[in-house]
Regions:
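Boundary at the C-terminal end of the N-terminal hydrophobic targeting segment
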Residues: 58-60
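Helix-terminus loop motifs that line ligand-binding clefts
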Residues: 179-221, 454-458
Length: 531
């Protein structure tokens, strides 16, 4: 989950995005997000049109005078989503890889032998999972418990472990038949991230951000992690069979998937705990120790300023109501499970996975996921920029834009990189939605025009650059777009660009590296439905 502007500089409740000196994705994505209390339910923050969901979380700021909204500014009217309306239904198995068992190898189509692709994937895996601990790997084993080895995937630059990365790591492991790594990650997630305290209304979900020692940075969940947990567990059940306890993969997948739709509506008063025996989680009075924050402290000191820890008013006791991760009326995954959230994140939408859940998941939920797949396909078409193919980081359930206090709609940002991969994999596996070809053509044509080796990683939906960084993760996911794009020079150029891109290393290797490795697997036909 990525909300732009969190680590920008400003006074109280001042979060503005500047093009100059753009923070890296790991600086901005998810840092400081906790239990995800809805901003739109907070009169204080609603005035500013900011999605600040940081219950009990310290957010780093540079100390500056408090900025006031202009006199003529008036708070936005709370949005009421329109009914879903008619959605084109796409029953049956389609004509994609699920039916044909054929997965395109885009690299082989351009003259790179399959054995070279497999070697490239294995090299990336070994570096990211077992390479040098300072510069290359993001997978770290931490001993064992009664369930076996324990390991986490870390966002190195922010020094935390996230359900997003844990579930991505599990998906990579099951696809590449790396059972030890899969089980160690799943064991760590269950041991430390699974919320078991019945007084936490997010009980049964996984806390989205943790310190790498297993202590919390949050006490709430982000649905993109749960989604990849579910899919990787079903694949593990089919690849390795079911074991006992937490290694009964199908039972665990069913349990999470049921919870995503049927989690009871619970209200609690925080601060909350992950486990009953834990102390209540209250954010520290300083920024979390990390390479990103250290750099920001140095930059602030050079200007004669001090990096301060900003605490939201919810550090005091607060009430929070949590329910399902889906909106029943709109058949959509929610941004977070808070009851008052009325918007989604396009990059959370995984119609290729939903089709499988409609076949493999709990019987009572299969029709829901079948329709959710069709809704996601329709949403991609309706929320993308008509000339650019860029998706917003967030939009309302009725496909309308979320407008900030300055009148600007939510832009294409770091989470958004994943959307093109999501609809293109859906096209590859199911071949049900021909409009996905048009969408891949649009985004590839736009970014090619920006410069295939120089396009930036944040834009307005109509194509105005909002950053100055060219990101490997975005190159990788856009290359996956070639699974759906019209074959031609542009789609081939993106595949070749990914082929010649080295494995990400250094401080920002987490998000770029995860997307890079999964994209190599998709583009080579090695990311498959495991039946």
């Amino acid at each position: 989950m990525c909300l732009p502007g969190l680590e920008t500089q400003g006074g109280d409740f001042e979060f503005e995005v500047e093009k100059v000196k753009t923070p890296t994705p790991s600086q901005t994505r998810r840092q400081g997000w906790g239990s995800h209390l809805s901003v739109f339910a907070s009169p204080i923050l609603q005035v500013f049109g900011v999605s600040l969901l940081c219950v009990g979380v310290a957010v780093s700021q540079v100390s500056k005078p408090t900025a006031k909204p202009p006199v003529e500014f008036s708070p936005p009217v709370p949005h009421t989503n329109a009914p879903l309306g008619l959605i084109p239904r796409m029953p049956g198995d389609g004509d994609g890889a699920y039916k044909t068992h054929h997965y395109r190898d885009l690299f082989a189509e351009q003259g790179h032998p399959p054995e070279e692709s497999r070697a490239k994937i294995e090299k990336a895996f070994q570096r990211l999972f077992h390479g040098d601990g300072q510069e290359q790997r993001i997978y770290f084993e931490t001993g064992a418990n009664e369930n076996g080895a324990l390991a986490y995937i870390t966002d190195w630059a922010n020094n935390d472990a996230r359900t997003e990365g844990m579930s991505y790591g599990m998906m990579i492991a099951v696809q590449l038949n790396k059972k030890r790594e899969f089980d160690a990650l799943w064991n760590w997630a269950n041991t430390y991230m699974l919320i078991t305290d019945p007084k936490d209304p997010s009980v049964g979900y996984f806390a989205w951000s943790m310190n790498t020692d297993g202590t919390p940075r949050s006490t709430g969940a982000a649905p993109d992690g749960e989604e990849y947990f579910v899919m990787s567990l079903y694949f593990a059940a089919h690849r390795w069979g079911n074991g006992q306890g937490i290694y009964n993969y199908k039972a665990e997948a069913d349990k999470i998937l049921r919870g995503m739709r049927h989690h009871p509506v619970l209200t609690g008063v925080g601060p909350f705990r992950i486990h009953h025996e834990d102390p209540p989680f209250v954010a520290p009075d300083h920024s979390w120790p990390s390479p990103n924050n250290k750099r920001r402290e140095q930059e602030a000191a050079a200007k004669g300023e001090k990096l301060q820890a900003f605490h939201a008013p919810w550090d005091a006791p607060h009430s929070e109501t949590i329910g399902p991760m889906v909106d029943e009326d709109h058949f959509m995954i929610k941004f977070v499970a808070n009851q008052d959230i009325n918007f989604t994140d396009a990059s959370y939408h995984l119609p290729a996975f939903y089709e499988l859940w409609a076949r493999w998941g709990p019987e009572e939920d299969r029709e829901f996921w079948a329709k959710a797949a069709d809704v996601s396909r329709d949403m991609f078409l309706k929320v993308t920029g008509p000339e650019t193919g860029l998706t917003p980081d967030r939009n309302y359930f009725d496909f309308t834009q979320i407008i900030s206090r300055d009148g600007a709609p939510t832009p294409f940002s770091y989470d958004s990189w994943r959307s093109v991969s999501n609809w293109s994999v859906d096209y590859s596996w199911w071949h049900k939605a021909p409009q996905e070809t048009m969408l891949s053509d649009r985004i590839q044509n736009f970014l090619y025009g920006q410069g295939i080796g120089t396009f930036v990683d944040r834009y307005t939906l109509d194509g105005k650059p909002l950053s100055d960084r060219h990101s490997v993760g975005m190159v990788a996911t856009t290359a996956v777009g070639s699974l759906a794009a019209t074959p031609g020079p542009i789609s081939k150029a993106f595949v070749e660009e990914l082929w010649k891109t080295p494995v990400p290393s250094g401080e920002q290797r987490y998000y770029d590296g995860m997307l890079y490795l999964m994209s190599l697997m998709h583009c080579s036909g090695n990311f498959r439905i495991i039946e």
